[in-house]
Amino acid sequence: MNILQYTFFQNALLGAFLTSILCGIIGTYIVTRRLVFISGGITHASFGGIGIGVFTGINPILAAMIFAILSGFGVQWMSSRKDVRKDSAIAMFWTLGMSVGIICCFLTPGFMPDLPSFLFGSILTIEGSDLWLLGILTCITIAVFTCFLRPIQSVAFDSTFARSQHLPVAAIEYLMMTLIAMTIVASLKMVGIVLAISLLTIPQMTANLFTYNYKQMIFASIILGWIDCIIGLYASYVLNVPSGATIIFVSIMVFMLSKTIKALQNKLYKKDKLSLEKK
């Protein structure tokens, strides 16, 4: 029986495609700007918003998005001050979100069937509303990067130089922190809080092995992320294992394979160079 005839699998493929575009664009900024630890902190802090949403009856994704954005702003503001180190600010909001989420979940009466999907992801349960959220956020992100690619790229590579060029570095950083937080929350249905940061870093790390060009990294990350999702989805269906974890496992295997290929290429290049020098 053809698996593509199932609506839930079609939704999963579309969700994976939109997420690949979104994470490919935002993840390239994260890796280039070296914000992986901050993004990990925002990812886990978003659990506080999920807990508040479940406890109050508000949409957990909406609550998580608000909480994640505020956490990102908090980290950005505190780390800009000289009296608080960036890693300390990240750790504080990371643990704050997790503690608030745990307390709210325990205070919520009854069983919470959606909680595991937020923690570990459940891409096969993606619905129309999730696709609309991913689609709208993807369009917004593409529009922002199309209009402001050069200043964003300048801040990503060297914020000090960007500031010397009179670019609005603080505004760009807060804008990107907003998009990072929204992307993380929008990706929770894919792989969950535990693994969400992987979608924003591993395809970009793989792409970075072969190119340092910012635009090329974005496009390569999107393609690699999409391939990882397709292989991971199919493998999870065949093996009957969680799809989110399988997608991340595939992406790591692709990175390790690419790293090996790159190392062999460098070794052969050095060998050829030495042989030419001897001649």
What are these regions (language model features)?
Residues V194-A245:
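Transmembrane alpha-helical segments in multi-pass inner-membrane proteins
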Residues L13-L18, I61-I66, A91-M92, L131-I136, ...:
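Hydrophobic alpha-helical transmembrane segments
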Residues M1-I21:
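Membrane-interfacial amphipathic/re-entrant helices at transmembrane-helix boundaries
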Residues D130-I202:
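Helix-loop-helix "hairpin" substructures at the membrane interface of multi-pass membrane proteins
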